Amino acid sequence: GEFTWKLADHPKLPKGKTIAMVVLDGWGEAKPDQYNCIHVAETPTMDSFKKTAPERWRLIKAHGTAVGLPTEDDMGNSEVGHNALGAGRIYAQGAKLVDLALASGKIYEGEGFKYVKECFDKGTLHLIGLLSDGGVHSRLDQLQLLLKGAAEHGAKRIRVHVLTDGRDVIDGTSVGFAETLEKDLENLREKGVDAQVASGGGRMYVTMDRYENDWNVVKRGWDAQVLGEAPYKFKSAVEAIKKLREEPKANDQYLPPFVIVDENGKPVGPIVDGDAVVTINFRADRMVMLAKALEYENFDTFDRVRFPKIHYAGMLQYDGELKLPSHYLVSPPEIERTSGEYLVHNGVHTFACSETVKFGHVTFFWNGNRSGYFNPEMEEYVEIPSDVGITFNVQPKMKAIEIAEKARDAILSGKFQQVRVNIPNGDMVGHTGDVEATVVGCKAADEAVKMIIDAIEQVGGIYVVTADHGNAEDMVKRDKSGKPMADKSGKIQILTSHTLQPVPIAIGGPGLTPGVRFRSDIPTGGLANVAATVMNLHGFEAPSDYEPTLIEAVDN
């Protein structure tokens, strides 16, 4: 029939309840040991959900195919997680989109590739990005395919600017990745393509800063990649990585910037007028700052010295709000008819809040990579400024309590039927690898949840508490059997990345109709099932193409 925004009434659940939708960032479920910061932390609120109402607590999948990523080995992340939570359906995402475009060859027919190809005759193609198979920001096999494809489509001179990982993969693996890359480049040279590594550095020290935390990181990369200037000069990437790990004893994440030079000591690949540049990461957050420096004419955050006239494209578009970069090799998923848009069309007043580092997740990504309000009369979004210029283990409580206070006030105001927040501690503090600080962060997050639940109790509302992916629940690298791994000196290897763990979802509150419980027939439920669940709690049936609801209402 004819499309309509109007949702059918739920046969058993009433409309008009105030619903708190709480997303704990980086909060998975794992076995309770000393590396599970959620277990170690005092988290009485989250514990009570599981203990007191087991029929209203369960685990859902937040990684791999459940969120549109290629395989079950792909960790979830905040962007795809919030897309799934808000959209109610599973869309091919990030790496998967790139895989499909590379496999079909569509990537070479797109506007973005054609744009960079215009420079192949006279200029150099530069590829900049994270060199690892971590699958969080980039994947080595995609770089390998793109190198091969670019050469087949006419690139005559190629320079690769590598960023070493050691954060999403084990420290020290960058040597092997560099060896693989250099072998591929050697094969291209045998085929007559002038291809080599031009520069490099560790991801946390060179280029890959995020949220404008430290522009010096981007400047160090710019100096090496664009200007060909760096404190260290080497003949090859493998030599560079090996030597810098010995002296100044840097780990992969923090390798100082280096350039590759020829026998005369001249850098082999600065970026100059007439060149093409592609940033090969598919994940956006740590490419946005470099993209600004490469694209914005009137950029003044640091002195670029030279602003080369180049054709620049991202692997994907990194910021839909800023339309940045304006050219990209792979188009984003078209996410239409998100739950937020439906609910606003059906009279649900909505409040959303987080601090800067996750504000975009609870708004832009939740709404299907779309900026702004659906209807400003019906919605209010509040951003609390995050602490800047520090790593979050220094302030592990972050703005959890401030976010909860805003949510509480919104709930008690009576103006909103949905109050949606993201509490970032588990993820942002977990990424620092500081176990003690992460424990403090998890406790603060639990206190924030309590404050929101208390407000829901006061207004007779309903709460839904879940997470977007794991992080804080497992802070150690493990071997295949699950045993913690140590480095050569016997020191435990800390895991700073997201995980493959499922995440909890709990529902409750005085407004919840008695007899509502989780269904037993959706064992593989994931984040995308949450949207239909929340629509039901608002008193509506979900659209027929949404992933099925997790709940049922049984007559008592």
Curated annotation (Swiss-Prot):
Tissue pattern of expression reads: Found ubiquitously in germinating seed.
What is this enzyme's catalytic activity, as reactions? (2R)-2-phosphoglycerate = (2R)-3-phosphoglycerate
Chief location:
cytoplasm
Q: Give the note describing cofactor binding and stoichiometry.
A: Binds 2 manganese ions per subunit.
> Which keywords does this chain's UniProt record carry?
Cytoplasm, Glycolysis, Isomerase, Manganese, Metal-binding
**Enzyme group, top EC level?**
isomerase
Required co-factor(s) are: Mn(2+)
> Which CDD domains does the record match to this protein?
iPGM
Task: State any GO BP term from the record.
Answer: glycolytic process
What is its subcellular localisation? Cytoplasm
Residues that hold Mn(2+) 2 according to the record: 25, 78, 468-469
The active site annotation covers: 78 (phosphoserine intermediate)
Residues annotated to bind substrate: 137, 167-168, 203, 210, 283-286, 358
Q: Which domain of life is it from?
A: Eukaryota
User: Which ranges does the record mark as transmembrane?
Assistant: none
| GO CC, alphabetical | cytoplasm
GO molecular function: any one? manganese ion binding
Identify the EC number(s): 5.4.2.12
Q: Which InterPro entries match?
A: Alkaline_phosphatase_core_sf, BPG-indep_PGM_N, Metalloenzyme, PGAM_B_sf, Pgm_bpd_ind
Could you tell me which PANTHER family the record lists for this protein? 2,3-BISPHOSPHOGLYCERATE-INDEPENDENT PHOSPHOGLYCERATE MUTASE, 2,3-BISPHOSPHOGLYCERATE-INDEPENDENT PHOSPHOGLYCERATE MUTASE 1
Q: Which family does it belong to?
A: Belongs to the BPG-independent phosphoglycerate mutase family.
Could you tell me what this protein does? Catalyzes the interconversion of 2-phosphoglycerate and 3-phosphoglycerate.
UniProt protein name = 2,3-bisphosphoglycerate-independent phosphoglycerate mutase
- Specify the species: Ricinus communis (Castor bean)
